[in-house]
C-alpha cells in the first residue's frame, strides 16, 4: 500500500493492509474474479473512504469493488504533525492467483 507522505498512516480495522485485502476478498466471494486490481481511495479525517478508483478488471467488476471499498468500515485516519488529515491511498489486490 502506498500513501501520500504523512507521519501516521491510516489503518483499516485490525490494523493491517492484509486485513483490508482479506475483507475485500470476502466481500467478493463467489464473484469469480481473477487477476490484479489497483484500488485508489482517500481516507478522510473521520475515517471514511471517499474518491474510490478501481482499475484492472472489467467495468462490472470494477464497479462492484468500488462499492465494496466505498462502504468499508471506517479506518483510523492518518495524521500529520499531530493533526488528522485526508490521505490518498493506493494498493494492488490479487484475486484468484
Each language-model region and where it sits:
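Charge-biased low-complexity segments
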Residues: 1-97
